[in-house]
Each structure stands twice: as structure tokens, then as C-alpha cells.
């Protein structure tokens, strides 16, 4: 437990803890029906018809990142978060990683709202794809050889996983693509440790505006 919730990586530890607690609560309150649509909805999964009917439920765009559909879904995503989250905190810093994770997840869920309007969807994958994409961007922007190599490695993983999202049933391609787009934009917005001048202020401003505009457009389309 001490190794998992490491104080050197407070944000990764926080997200692991919250997601684990949600998963345990789902099982304790619903038993082996914890993957039912009713339970997923109760704990905050994205369900576009509900958000459209009750716009005040846009909080689901954030909460769905902490809800998982089954043990395998939970374990795979938490293992990915455990390893990738630590790298993200080292590269971007804890504060920046906090926002990249949450906002990438939100962007992925906005894509679900628009492009999967009848599906009930949940999982940290939207945020994880954003993390992958944010490191891939550094492949082309950073002068650090380590970050360039890491970005190249994650580019291959990102492509493979996106292809898998297309071929495998029950996978939210919209959420994964949206999360990746969000993460790529946020990698420009938030500075990298030791390379704060990697982008000019104007470039950061354009990326910020693009993220906000895309989010607002998707929300408008999804609600109306």
C-alpha cells in the first residue's frame, strides 16, 4: 500500500485512491450487480440522454473518469495510471498533471456526449489517452532526448490502442479520441519541468483557446 500511494507522486496516489474507493463502494452497495447500468448511472457514468434532459448533470463529464465497468476494466486502467501517472508528475509536475488528467477525461466524455449519444460510458481511459497524447506531443516539441524517445514509444502505443478501440466491441472510440485530442492541446498549455519556454506565450494562448472553444462547441451540440 505504501508503494502504491507514494507521497512523491501525490496526484497519482490521489486519483488511484479515489477510483479504488469508488470501485469498492460500487461493489459494497450493489454486490455482483455493480456493473449494471443502474449502478453505473448512480455512481456518475456518462449517460447522454440524462445530461441532455438535465443539463445540471454535466458533472458526469468529470465523475465518469472514476467509475469502471468490471474488475478487468478497473485493474487495467489503474495499472496504467500507476505507471504513467508517475511519469506525468515527473515531466509536468503534480499541479499540471492534476489538470491534464481531469480535463483530458472531460474532453473525452464530451466526445462521448456528442458521438455516442445513447451509450452509458465510464472509465479512466479518456484521461489515460490524454496522458499518452500529451507525452507524444513532446516527441516533436522537446529538446530533451529522453522525452523525445519516450514520446516516440508512446506514439506507437497510442496508435496500437486506437486501432484496438476500432476493432474491439464495447470500447468507446469517441472517448479515446477525444481524450487524446484534449491531452495533446493541454501538453501545449501546461509547461514541462525544466523546459518552460518550449512554447511561446502565443502558442499556449492558441492551444488554450482551441481547448475552450472545442469544449464549448461539443457541450452545446451535446445539449441542444
Regions picked out by a protein language model, each given a short descriptive name:
Residues 1-11, 162-224:
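C-terminal transmembrane module of polytopic alpha-helical membrane proteins
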Residues 4-8, 49-56, 147-150:
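Helix-boundary and loop/linker segments of multi-pass membrane transporters
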Residues 11-122, 169-171:
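N-terminal TM1-TM2 helical hairpin plus the immediately adjacent luminal interfacial "cap"
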Residues 12-17, 98-102, 128, 154-155, ...:
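Hydrophobic alpha-helical transmembrane segments
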Residues 23-30, 112, 116, 138, ...:
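Structural signal for membrane-spanning alpha-helices in multi-pass inner-membrane proteins
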Residues 74-81, 122-134, 172-190:
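Alpha-helical transmembrane segments that form the membrane-embedded catalytic/substrate-binding core
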Residues 88-93, 143-150, 193-202:
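Membrane-interface helix-boundary motifs at transmembrane edges
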Residues 105-106, 131-135, 155-164, 209-214:
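Small-residue-rich segments of transmembrane alpha-helices in multi-pass membrane proteins
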